[in-house]
Amino acid sequence: MSPHISPSKDTPSQRLPIPLSLPTHLGLLAKAYGVPPASILQLAWGLVLRCYFTTSSSRWGTIDMAHEYKEKKNLPIRCEVLELDDTRSIGWILQNWNDPSVHRHLPAEEDTSNVPVSAGSIVILTEDAKDLEVLRDFELTAEWIICFSTSTEKPLLRLSWRPDVIHSELASHLAQLLERALDTTFLSPDIPLSQINLFSILDHQKLLQWNHQYPQSVNRLVHEMFEDMVAARPQATAVAAWDGEVTYQQLDRLSTRLAIKLQTIDLQPESIVALCFEKSVWAIVAMLGVLRAGGAFLHIDPKHPTARQQAMISTTAARIILCSEQTRDTVSRFDSESLSLVVDRKMFAQEPDHKQVALPSPNNLGPRNAAYIVCTSGSTGLPKAIVVEHVSLCTSVTAQAEAMAVGGESRILQYAAYTFDVSVGDVFTALTHGACVCIPSDWERTQDLVGAINRLDVNQACLTSTVASFLTPMNVPKLQKLTLGGEPASKQCIDLWSGKVALKNVYGPAECTVWCVIQKNASSEIPASNIGRGIGARTWIVHPENHNQLMPIGAVGELLIEGPLVARGYLNDAERTTAVFLERAPSWLATFGPLPPQTRFYKTGDLARFEQNGTLFFEGRKDTQVKLRGQRIELGEIEYQIQQACNPVPPLAVELIETKDLQAPLLGAFITWTGGLEISLDQSAVPNGLGPDLDARSHFNELVSRIQANIDRTLPPYMMPGLYIPVQKLPLSTSGKLDRKVLRQYCTQHTRSFLTASEAESSDVIADDATKDDVALHEIVNPGEITLAQLWAHALGRRMESINAKDNFLSLGGDSLAAMRLVNLAARDAQVTLTVANIFESPVLADQARLLRPLSKTKSLAPFELMTRGEASIEDIVGFAAQQCRLLPAQIEDVYPCTPLQEEMMRDSLSNDRTQMGQEVVQISEELDLVRYQVACASVYRRFPILRTRFIEHSGRLVQVVVREDLCWKQPTSLAEYKALDSRERPALGKPLTRWALTSDGTHFILSLHHAMFDGITLGQIQGAIYAVYQCIPLPPPSVSFATFLAHLDDQNAPLSQESQRFWQSYLCPSASLDASITPETQKIDRPRASCGTQRLVQFTSGEVSALQRHGLTEATLVRGAWACTLARHQQKPHASAFSDVIFGTMLTGRNFHLPGVDMLAAPSLTHVPIRIRIDEGDLNGHSARALLARVQADATAMIPYEHDGMNRIRSIEVQTRAVFNRIRTLLVIQPIPEGLTSVSTSPFPGSIVSGPRVEAKEMGHFHWYGLLVECTLLPTKGFFVRVSYDNKMFGTEQVESLLDDYSTTLHTLANGLMDTDIPASLHV
């Protein structure tokens, strides 16, 4: 019903006369209040618009032919505005009709195409009914027109509409509403507007047709429905998780054993058990075990701030907490007397198997007992704990399974966070209907969802529109059914999936047990806001301020849910329960048939309207509750926590906003700086609250810092405001309420920087010379600083205007990967040199700018140049290489040396059973054009020399040979057989080290390649290039060649330089206590072989990350320092001392020098070096965290010039140094996610990676020769994924698990130590 006047005249309008049942009353009422009859009509139309748009301000366009516009040509359209205050009566409004605060009109517009009207309507007034005939052109162009002849003899009222825009049934309904509004105006001029009800008999008939049947209640226990499936499908897979699979029978036995254990500690019905788990099969065992023991479960997010976790425990009085080994440390920090139990394999290994023991039925447990509790945010700062009963959950999963076609063949993705009620629907809809719950790891959930969906064979998923938009149908070919829920679906997402899957759009607040409304046939033809019909519930639309008043069909009102799936209420909170859960049925319910027993109603606070076919159209929220990225957020809770940090408390508001330059919604906190409120009649822009006062800016920034520090401890990350916006006043509506719409509109008109006052008008901000001098202290002034600020902005993804001369690169979020980007941007775009060491040693922009030097031109290398610097000729080199590779000399493209690590890896695979070969297996989508796919692969094969590289031995050393050849495909008939044979094929000198295969049925692509041929960045380049060529996306010019890279390294055959030897002797100089061994001497072996593995996810809190940035430290530094502390704590020292020296190996990216394009080098640049760190006693408890991590980072920076010296050459320096290497038993690898290195490499490929070079942890022994490897992949989500492989002859499983537990604890200990430490003076801005 949005307004506009369309120029189209293709569709003739339709007309409907509206009878005036009381025509004489019109004149009498007009005379009584001294207004024209037309004013009464306009008031009635305003009441109709108010009903449809739930606004106190109604607008429409008016053409008044009764006065000066007798020409009937170029008729001006005037915008009428009518303010309708609920507390006023119809008579009062007519009496004050000429008061501008009640009724006013904007100046007439000559151009009728730009009429600013609401509801797309034009009201035409005339004294002569004949004049209406000249208005046919208007009837052809406006959506609808109300024509009114005020003739005293025979008043005439007519509705015209365009049927291509307005449905005839809706038009007829509008005509009836207008007729009813006029009758109400005539007969009840003295009643308040709030009591006017336009609901008609026709509306009642339609609602009776849609809601005649009360939903069937399923009066059972949830676990009884699960037990039905155990009996029917005992060997079917119930849960397929990243950490294990269980059948229905196995899940039955595990949950029974847990239930029996819980019953032994006196768990009773209505007792609440808190669950604190990462994504895991054991979380499902815990949920089901609690239910079968008779209790109710409550999920707690292990990543949320401790204060919020504690509030949930306190609110629910949970006296038992079930957790995992990974979350045990989190639970131990709770200030609670609750008993905590770790649920994992160890628990069931220690407990007897009760498979033959019947589970005792809990006393008095019935369908009306609590099944689970879910907490949502609350406006008082405390979470609201919703109590959902068994009957509600059973009714809900039964209705959902039918609506979503869930059955024994369904493999349902469990994506939603456990604290989100959708997870309960995922799990129990599946387990009560014989389906399989598919659970990715937390890392897969955020970093590789496509891969997880394909690896788990998911065919059904429920996702938010945002997440679903990240996927494409081509990439998840097995996904057959997709449900969008948790937030309003976007049209773009529906268009993406429409016709590709069975698409559904659902709605449901947590108080109504997951989903209660569903659009079963979502498609591009149906508006995204159409959420369908109720399931397991009846739906009603009531007046937003009075639930005893039904709204007419098509009018916007509050959505009211009725049925057995409505929750019991809020735990121990009668006041808030009474406010939204109705104790009594509304008075109108009896008119729709016999009252159902124990019916429940929930006032959702959501605005919606009925379409003419009975489906619901979602319109938004009526209060301060919003949804962001699927999370339900009470804005009042955020406002409350901000207020706790402010003294005195200024007027403030938090709103979900979009800015002019950022289209993704985010939370904005509006804080009044001058302190005040103002009435907003014209909805003008909100004035910025700081203006030219630079002192005010400084104080405001201090306030924001204080707020952030406070809410970081009390609110989860998804509730953190993304913007803090200073304003002079908050706008109010005429009713005195905060006008949130004005705040939202204000943000859409300005950029993010302008809103936060960091982007100001320079002429306005700098008020006088003194102020200019103050600004100049931080202002970027010289060309070097300007150049560097531009490079920083690019490397960090910031606006240049937000960077000043005293900013710290690390404090702005820079890390080693960002530093590498900066080095290469400097060389490529500015032709200046900058090293990673420069960046870490001088992180402040002004200091860093002084280190910039002009870049010397990189000399391009001729083929074979690196091999002909001695006595050998090109002919000799080419001939020898051709002979070794069994090729023609013309096929030899280039020959150059290896990196130290390449030679190390290749020689290891030649002399041992470690092949160093990785296999990437891709499942091909049916939609893929195989010919085009193979052409793309062949093109990439020719583009990247590393794919055409072989190794040969020349003069006692290995060198690499680039050959000219086309891609040769293998076509195996069996994937499994090929993988087995290929993995056993040993690499050899002179032979290809990449193998390409496509199964004969075209379903799988297998790329095998030696680890000496790639690193993470190279692999990303290859994958991205294949995708780009397939999609006809132009590739960027080739980056620096591998030969040019090698030319920048020292001669790897020559001894180390004196400078390098001095560095390594000093760095590795052992002390008496040096011993990084964590294994007994009897367990040490010469050539360890890792054959076992484990993995886990470690998350940093936003406070820990902020502390790192404030101290100018990187996450990689924390990871390295914590590992050193862990080794020190576990090592077997020869004697007691106050400190320990630890040493371990590590892999570095090897791209930390100023060679233009090195960040895009498509070749392995990794380097292998030892790391030695001295650990003092204070380092182990976090008391000297900053000092320790500063040493670790300084040592890493100092090592940069020498990191390519190579482990073998370092080992050969002297006997004392060689002895150090005998103590190295562990390898730490830190893998940053290569964001920003190439946009192409992040693009999804049509297919799914089944397995790849990032093999399972236990299989990583094929790629290294350490007894223990710890690989930490840094994640954009502020944490890292740890994979460990180990030789079980050197390390026991319990020992490794203990080591990892200690490592995780140490990471948080050091990070928390930083939070309690002052920022060093060198980092103050």
UniProtKB/Swiss-Prot annotation:
Region (Adenylation): 248-644
Keyword Phosphoprotein: yes
The entry's keywords: Ligase, Phosphopantetheine, Phosphoprotein
Key word Ligase present: yes
Chain spans, region Condensation: 893-1310
Positions where O-(pantetheine 4'-phosphoryl)serine occurs in the chain: S816
A single GO BP: secondary metabolite biosynthetic process
InterPro entries on file: AA_adenyl_dom, ACP-like_sf, AMP-bd_C_sf, AMP-binding_CS, AMP-dep_synth/lig_dom, ANL_N_sf, CAT-like_dom_sf, Condensatn
Domain notes: NRP synthetases are composed of discrete domains (adenylation (A), thiolation (T) or peptidyl carrier protein (PCP) and condensation (C) domains) which when grouped together are referred to as a single module. Each module is responsible for the recognition (via the A domain) and incorporation of a single amino acid into the growing peptide product. Thus, an NRP synthetase is generally composed of one or more modules and can terminate in a thioesterase domain (TE) that releases the newly synthesized peptide from the enzyme.
UniProt protein name: Nonribosomal peptide synthetase
